[in-house]
Amino acid sequence: MPVKRSLKLDGLLEENSFDPSKITRKKSVITYSPTTGTCQMSLFASPTSSEEQKHRNGLSNEKRKKLNHPSLTESKESTTKDNDEFMMLLSKVEKLSEEIMEIMQNLSSIQALEGSRELENLIGISCASHFLKREMQKTKELMTKVNKQKLFEKSTGLPHKASRHLDSYEFLKAILN
């Protein structure tokens, strides 16, 4: 037997069913990030005006200015000042490291009184003192190497890169002259 099917759409169609208030529209694609697919939370999160975009991408848009700043000419003076400041900070760290070692010893004695390893696991008392001493020694060695290299460059008049490419004869000749 044939089955008769009919769609009763007359009740569903109304005259105002196509009003803009009833049609749900998708959000603008512009508000979504192409990399993450997430919606932008704030309108002020990234610059939207072209002037702000120019300032933000100035270097990448090949609008580079020549770098004749006075700060670049003073870079040699600032490196010596930075080196001196670094050495002063290093000496402060050495002094403070001794205090830290004393505090760690006190904590380890407290740990011995407690009889548990929870304090050691929490703070890491057992190996921290060795690491601190080792790092301080490495930093000192590196700073002395840097200072020796700078003194060598000043005495020979050769830049560091040029001294790398010399063979032993040219190196000795440069030192003697």
Curated annotation (Swiss-Prot):
> Which Pfam families does the protein's record reference?
CENP-R (PF06729)
Q: Report where the covalent cross-link Glycyl lysine isopeptide (Lys-Gly) (interchain with G-Cter in SUMO2) sits.
A: 8, 22
Enumerate the residue ranges of region (DD1).
20-50
Q: Where is this motif: LXXIL motif?
A: 172-176
What is the official name of this protein in its record?
Centromere protein R
Q: Which GO terms describe its cellular component?
A: cytoplasm; cytosol; inner kinetochore; membrane; nucleoplasm; nucleus
Keyword Nucleus carried by entry: yes
Found, by tissue, as follows: Widely expressed. Expressed in spleen, thymus, prostate, ovary, small intestine and white blood cells. Highly expressed in testis and colon. Isoform 4 is expressed in platelets, lymphocytes and granulocytes.
PTM Phosphoserine: list the residues.
Answer: 17, 28, 71
**Coiled coil located at which positions?**
83-113
Q: Which InterPro entries match?
A: CENP-R
Give the domain section of the comments. The DD1 domain (also called RepD1 domain) mediates the corepressor function and is essential in the triggering of apoptosis.
Q: What does this protein do?
A: Transcription coregulator that can have both coactivator and corepressor functions. Isoform 1, but not other isoforms, is involved in the coactivation of nuclear receptors for retinoid X (RXRs) and thyroid hormone (TRs) in a ligand-dependent fashion. In contrast, it does not coactivate nuclear receptors for retinoic acid, vitamin D, progesterone receptor, nor glucocorticoid. Acts as a coactivator for estrogen receptor alpha. Acts as a transcriptional corepressor via its interaction with the NFKB1 NF-kappa-B subunit, possibly by interfering with the transactivation domain of NFKB1.
Q: What spans are recorded as compositionally biased (Polar residues)?
A: 41-50
- Disordered: where is this region? 41-81
Subunit (UniProt): Homodimer; mediated by the coiled coil domain. Isoform 3, but not other isoforms, interacts with the cytoplasmic tail of integrin ITGB3. The relevance of the interaction with ITGB3 is however uncertain, since isoform 3 is mainly nuclear. Interacts with CCNA2 and MTA1. Interacts with NFKB1 NF-kappa-B subunit. Component of the CENPA-CAD complex, composed of CENPI, CENPK, CENPL, CENPO, CENPP, CENPQ, CENPR and CENPS. The CENPA-CAD complex interacts with the CENPA-NAC complex, at least composed of CENPA, CENPC, CENPH, CENPM, CENPN, CENPT and CENPU. Interacts with TASOR.
List the ranges annotated as motif LXXLL motif: 9-13
Arranged from A to Z, the UniProt key words for this protein are: Activator, Apoptosis, Cell cycle, Cell division, Centromere, Chromosome, Coiled coil, Cytoplasm, Isopeptide bond, Kinetochore, Mitosis, Nucleus, Phosphoprotein, Repressor, Transcription, Transcription regulation, Ubl conjugation
Give the GO biological process terms: apoptotic process; cell adhesion; cell division; CENP-A containing chromatin assembly; chromosome segregation; negative regulation of epithelial cell apoptotic process; positive regulation of epithelial cell proliferation; regulation of DNA-templated transcription
| Phenotypic consequence of residue 89 to R | Abolishes dimerization, but not interactions with nuclear receptors
User: What does the entry say induces or represses the expression of this protein?
Assistant: By estrogen.
Q: Where is this motif: Nuclear localization signal?
A: 63-66
